Amino acid sequence: MRYNQFSYIPTSLERAAEELKELGFDLDLQKTAKANLESFLRKLFFHYPDSDYPLSHLIAKNDMDALSFFQSEQELSKEVFDLLALQVLGFIPGVDFTEADAFLDKLAFPIHFDETEIIKHIHHLLATRCKSGMTLIDDLVSQGMLTMDNDYHFFNGKSLATFDTSQLIREVVYVEAPLDTDQDGQLDLIKVNIIRPQSQKPLPTLMTPSPYHQGINEVANDKKLYRMEKELVVKKRRQITVEDRDFIPLETQPCKLPIGQNLESFSYINSYSLNDYFLARGFANIYVSGVGTAGSTGFMTSGDYAQIESFKAVIDWLNRRATAYTSHSKTHQVRADWANGLVCTTGKSYLGTMSTGLATTGVDGLAMIIAESAISSWYNYYRENGLVCSPGGYPGEDLDVLTELTYSRNLLAGDYLRHNDRYQELLNQQSQALDRQSGDYNQFWHDRNYLKNAHQIKCDVVYTHGLQDWNVKPRQVYEIFNALPSTINKHLFLHQGEHVYMHNWQSIDFRESMNALLCQKLLGLANDFSLPEMIWQDNTCPQNWQERKVFGTSTIKELDLGQELLLIDNHYGEDEFKAYGKDFRAFKAALFEGKANQALVDILLEEDLPINGEIVLQLKVKSSENKGLLSAQILDYGKKKRLGDLPIALTQSSIDNGQNFSRESLKELPFREDSYRVISKGFMNLQNRNNLSSIETIPNNKWMTVRLPLQPTIYHLEKGDTLRVILYTTDFEHTVRDNSNYALTIDLSQSQLIVPIASN
């Protein structure tokens, strides 16, 4: 374990003493440091009628227990404080450590003993994470140190778990959206699942916009998947034009219906544990699946601003700008009298994507988004540089396949009976519009590109993204983060994992940082919390997070690739082609080991190479035919210890998100030896070699200069490392699988790897 503590708010002595007193700690500025520490420790054992017993189970020195120490005349020292602090946080002498000083250095322990600062040390200790993954104060509250009185209690600028999660209100409302996406002449209704604590105070809201939450249709999804085996189409030379079109909602009328009290209820919905954490701290949770999902009406428009509007309508309802009904019969309306109108959206992948889309509308009431692994351009999710390009792990998927997965109205047999014919018509229109034949950018994709509206974002923004996420690739967050207005508060956590959540990792206090931010933005708490704009997980060692100023630098280093002419054959033998098509993981293993069709260049680094931004391959290339696709991957190659990309559980169910509520496991990325690590990758249709809007012809056997931008990253390579460059054609995970007889030739003497270099 290593501390990377970004959430602690430095506090004055007076404020620290006041907050400790509010928690019931009987400390006195006039008492000695030793007396105050003893009083603090005894309060921790509030379950015991006699605190001597648990105090005797701690040691103050290697040869003295804590009870004996406090009964002695010995003075409090750094050695004693450190040893007791470690034990209070759950670290066991002789098991987790033998030498406390060395262990504290390894932990990067954030508290440095000064006898005159004991009150501040105790305050800081309570806000510091235990071995279990919870802060000490959260651990104490989870054990019942504070009663669940359904009111706010704060410590170090963060809300504590004092809302009763055993008496939650669970209700359903149906919000009227200014849409008619299925063109039935009726405004679409959006189902909203609400979970909120009982409270006399207006509550802020965490909203998870999740098209998955009302169910998914995996059978329809699998039937809709596309075969990847097809020839690369030769496209006609042309220029692509698109236009920015404002989304115009339909008109709605003020509602004059009576207020209804008898709301639909529910017992369970698959929740997001970060939401649960905040539910126990006085934040209502709502789950919204949007148009075309079970319980709602309309068509699943998948990614456009009509879908975004269906979520926006819910924020409007929370702020009395839209109508909600008690049921589909629309006999009574319902108001969000319990809400303070301020909203933060949460969720990963599609969920985070909807958060980004919502933010670009500038809707009033949306105070903050926490968007994890989020898409900012749907074209860049399903296409790349003029190619159909499947997201990592999902060959054959496209946006209409995702529509089939998430159009959960068809999971309700009655809805299927009444509406499936119309749904199939609209789905066919969507399949035609996305143009899987050419892979080109068009108006359909432009209408699903949130980057063009990034300037309208006015809420606070928090992004998290994995630099090993080949599903929602790093370009998605790179482009939106760098497009955000300079006038807003923005934050980015870049981790070394894949497509995963990070709120329950041991090495980073993400949960507590979000608590401090949300108390600022949604509760108006003046806590003076300041979070760095960008925090990056160091790839060279375990559990080390660093502040970074920018994602993408203008300083570059050009690396020569060699002097040879290298031939890349596109064609595979029939058996090999079929085998790779059945198992793209076997293809990846062969590719990285230099066995698949490729041109391979290994570069032994003579100095450190700190990459920050978008690597570009500038290549001199020619094709034997009038077509060609180019794929590239950059590897950190050779056996050494690296971070894995999938977090593993360190302890099971050790994190309590409330008071015995919604427990989850503590996780972390493992650090272990492996043979290589993908740093970046990229794909291009050579007919789009100049830009996305220009379709060029490819002259047979004529040299072309190609600039292939790879996925942005921040990655530190050290002197002596091997940088492996792999150039090839068909990628069996991502691209169409064209097995025709053509070859690419690369002139390495006229080619370079252009690397953005991080400054010191």
From Swiss-Prot:
Enzyme class per UniProt: hydrolase
Q: Give the catalysed reaction(s), semicolon-separated.
A: Hydrolyzes Xaa-Pro-|- bonds to release unblocked, N-terminal dipeptides from substrates including Ala-Pro-|-p-nitroanilide and (sequentially) Tyr-Pro-|-Phe-Pro-|-Gly-Pro-|-Ile
Matching entries from NCBIfam families are given as:
PRK05371.1-4
Q: Which family does it belong to?
A: Belongs to the peptidase S15 family.
Q: Which residues form a coiled coil?
A: none
Does the record's keyword annotation contain Protease? yes
The record's listing under Gene3D superfamilies reads: 1.10.246.70, alpha/beta hydrolase, Galactose-binding domain-like
| Subcellular compartments | Cytoplasm
The protein's job, in short, is: Removes N-terminal dipeptides sequentially from polypeptides having unsubstituted N-termini provided that the penultimate residue is proline.
Q: PANTHER family recorded for this chain?
A: COCE_NOND FAMILY, PUTATIVE (AFU_ORTHOLOGUE AFUA_7G00600)-RELATED, PEPTIDASE S9 PROLYL OLIGOPEPTIDASE
Give an example GO biological process.
proteolysis
Q: Does the keyword Cytoplasm apply?
A: yes
In short, the EC number is 3.4.14.11
State the Gene Ontology terms under molecular function. Answer: aminopeptidase activity; dipeptidyl-peptidase activity; serine-type peptidase activity
- Gene Ontology CC, one term: cytoplasm
Q: What is its main location?
A: cytoplasm
List the catalytic residues: S349, D469, H499
The entry's protein name is: Xaa-Pro dipeptidyl-peptidase
Q: Which UniProt keywords apply?
A: Aminopeptidase, Cytoplasm, Hydrolase, Protease, Serine protease
Please give the subunit comment from the record.
Homodimer.
